[in-house]
Amino acid sequence: MKKKILVVGKNSFVGNNLYNELKNLFDIKIVNYKSFFQISDYKLSSIDTIINCSISKNYVHKNYSIKNDRDLQICKKIKKFKCKMIFLSSRKVYLSGNNLRENSKLKPKCNYSKNKLKTEKRLSFNLKKRVLILRISNLIGIDNSKLKKKKIHKTFGDIFFQYIKKNIIFDNNKEYKDFISINK
């Protein structure tokens, strides 16, 4: 029997790519964030793993607020079930540098990374060993969705080309950027 996976984030770059990569291997469904909360407890109780790929614009840009923490809201709904949750955190929770490891120094600088670290702690507290935290790098790839203009934040490439168009080459102040292809 195939594992049942539910991906939340039907309109997201990561969610769509994850769904397409896993659809032949698992019994997988993809829904948007609002639709997730309309799923019955009966159906949720049969899910093995939930992966949230949706995010609030306010979560990215503003100070932490529980109402903007979609992962925590999902956690609250699934806490009573036995399903696991995969949390997509960020390598930005670490002090900038190369060769980062799980035990590298944590030093989030922006609201996004500070919020991710707070969510990690809240999910770990609530779900204990039922949460897998992945501190992923910058994901790049071709966005085949029709929602390209619905970006929550700019990528390194977006910023780079924005400056190039203005004939500005910027110094990265020893900030490290790492990129992983979405389809590898």
What does each model-identified segment do?
Residues I28-F37:
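A short beta-strand-loop structural module common to alpha/beta enzyme folds
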Residues Q73-K109, L132:
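Conserved Rossmann-fold NAD(P)-dependent oxidoreductase catalytic core, especially the SDR/UDP-sugar
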